Amino acid sequence: MFQKLLFPALLLLLAPALYAQTVTLRGTVVDTETNRPLIDVAVVVSGTGQVAATDQNGNFVLERLQPGQYALVLSSSGYFPLETPVNADKNEGPPVIFSLRRDPAVESITTPIPMLTLDEAESESEGGGEIANLLHASRDVFQTVAVFGWSTYRFRERGYDSEQFPLYLNGVAINDPETGTAFFGEFGGLNDVLRLRESTIGLEPSDFAFSEIGGATRIDTRASSQRKQIRASYALANRSYDHRLMLTASTGLMPGGWAVTLSGSHRWAQKGYIEGTFFQGTSYFLSVDKKIGLKHQFNLTLLGAPSKQGRAADTYQEMYDLAGTHYYNPNWGYQNGDKRNAVVRYSHQPIGILRYDWNPSRTTTLTATAYVQAGERGDSRLEYQGSNPSPDFNRNLPSAFEDPTQAASQADLLRNNESLRQLDWTSFYEINRNTPETVNDANGQAGNTITGNRAQFIVENQRGDSKESGFNAVLSEALSDRAKIQIGANYQWYQGENFKTVDDLLGADYWLDADKFAQRDIPGVVNVQDNDVRIPNHVVRKDEVFGYNYDENIRNGGLWTQVQANLPSLSVFIGGEVKVNNFWRTGRMQNGRFPANSLGDSEKLSFNTYGTKGGLTYKLNGRNYLYANGFYGTRAPQFRDAFLSPRVRNEVVPDLQPHQVQSVEGGYLLRSPRLRGRLTGYLTQFKNETEASLFYLYSLGVFGTSILRGVDRRHAGIEAALEAKPSAAWTISAAGNLGDYHYTSRPLLYVTQDNTSEPIVNGARVYQENYLVPRTPQTTALLGIKYEGRRFWFASLTATFADDLWYDFDRTRRTAAYVESLVKDSEPWHRALDQQKAPAAFSLDFFGGKSWKINNYFLYLNVGVNNLLNNQDIIISGRDSYRSNYANAAEDLRFYTNELTYGYGTNYFISLTFRK
């Protein structure tokens, strides 16, 4: 019913808009240096009380002016104010172009998005949703005062995953086709050249994409859009990296129509905030523009950011208590006196983008982009033949001992001997060097005998390499002075290469590529243990592929269109899109457990989806606005959710279908010289989603896949923000988010394992209705104050609060089969079913800066200190533990533990920048 009523109503509103003419004053505000449109510039008609603000294209409209001459005052943070006379005639003329000049002395104060505070460790965590919000942030009052303050708690705007916030780099959608997540490490460290961005909020229209329900962000990397400058900076921090050097040079648009920008950086830390972590990252960037006449412009952008990072892991509260710190990390240990981390992430996925802008007339623009990207991403981890060597393995914890005396003794050992809380690299080498074994007919060759020390422990590298190319084109046409239409087309070709290699044999001679549990689970089958039956008795050495090897083939295409119109007191838009999503798996190994269903191409899946969107904004006056927007559509499942055990077989999740998305939002906007505010209510429903996740079944010693079918959830809430400037020097900010994100269905659960076709759970009903959506605080608040001094310095203090961060929960415990043996309302019954949540959290943050002008040079100092009170009890992630090894787990209270991650205590970032 919603979509049936929406389109006729909006079409009736659009009809008179196409050719309506009124006495108004229209204009566009641009940057003098780059000629880029400026967003949210305050435009005041002196003596009348009328106020307007520029939109995302730099345009503003002042209506119902009496004919005559007026004085316009234009002001924007970081620019010199402009006062200029204008004539308001009876008939509208073409838009008047106004140019604002940057105030270089206050640059450090006015940088709209302080990317320098972005933490690389957070950028890849939990899907990166909270960082997606950071890059998505715009001049919108809610985002500018709230998103940065709440990023400490991994806040996700409206509870959405990052796939709902698509990110466009020079016209290219860079969200990962496999998962929908944007991996921001692909361009980390390039802050200086990624400042020029345009964002849409929620369901509002975008000129560059149809966007998703969270909005969209476009970053402009064209050299001609960059400020002409030479810029060098050094930063000192105690977060994921300690040091950062950056250098940027940009020519601006030169005679002959050329422009060039070069940028590079290096970030490093031998020890990150958490023990055992480290970071090494180098970034590079080249952008070249060629402008041909007034109508044609070409751009070539090349960038990359190779990085290597030793990572931390979540663990049990029991281990945090034994270690005496909330920053205990089980991933590392000493080797020959040096710290060594077993879990290291490496990534380098450079991208090349070719962009063409064509302006054949005043009313028509075309932007076309083609791109290619290729690279590798790898995560190392320990692989082993025997028992789990992790120091926080739950069988080794005091709580695993039934005898209280033994439990107390184990607790004393772990508490007082740090080496027992670390990986024992020395023992790995000793064991590997003393395990001689002979492999007959090695690698499938009769008579090929290999003798040597067979590895019991190795470091493996789980690779996720990829190749990608595509194009995106957007045509914009002004239908009249008050209406415009956009038409877009895009296509994406993607091949993901998933396999693992031997990274380090740890002193052994070889690793035997065989499933150690296959003969146990599938007895009597020839070659069942071989991961590739074409190479039985496969002996592998360093850098050789083993275990699994498959490709993800994805082909996506789409068309969209949108019409926007601006009446004197009403703005309306309507749009729609259609998409085709195709994908399939290609196995590169013939697995011994699935010899007929692992090698070659799987079934080719194809999904046709659509989306419709519309909305209106009613202008009460120049300062007060009401708006309402709606969306209805379908979305294809992601590749990650489509296969039962993608590492080893081609089997597809049965009855896989697109899911539905319905979303509405409405609210109030306040824009005045001293007050900016937004109050928004939103309601979004996701229906019939499929969710899949890979995990390790500790009780069986194998990897498995958990699949949920028929997942429904509802995200509802209120966003509010207010920014007040009682004087030119003072700014007071307040914001709040009150959300209610919960599941509304009882989906079916399938749990498979990688070494047998028999499911562990086959279509069990999961009673998760009314459980809360995890991984984000649903209640947040912020209060901030900022002072800007006359001698170009500023300081701000922000208090933030977060609550209702619910832990992710084990679906198998929410099935009838699991709880049937438990007494209702008993402690085990509640421990099995009740969803846990983190305690409420509070933080106090400081940010300040100072700038100096020395002849024609500028020096900027910025200081950011988060968590001034050193609150080390902020839980930012929690989940039910899957490490069940107790005989009677359902009744045994020791089984019901959570694995947690704590946010940083006091942490800082200090940067010094020189600019010419």
Language-model-derived ranges and their functions:
Residues 732, 801-820, 850-916:
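C-terminal beta-signal and adjacent terminal beta-strands/loops
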Residues 328-351, 355, 552, 602-611, ...:
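Outer-membrane beta-barrel signature, preferentially recognizing the C-terminal barrel domain
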Residues 314-319, 528-539, 582-593, 604, ...:
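Surface-exposed extracellular loop regions of Gram-negative outer-membrane beta-barrel proteins
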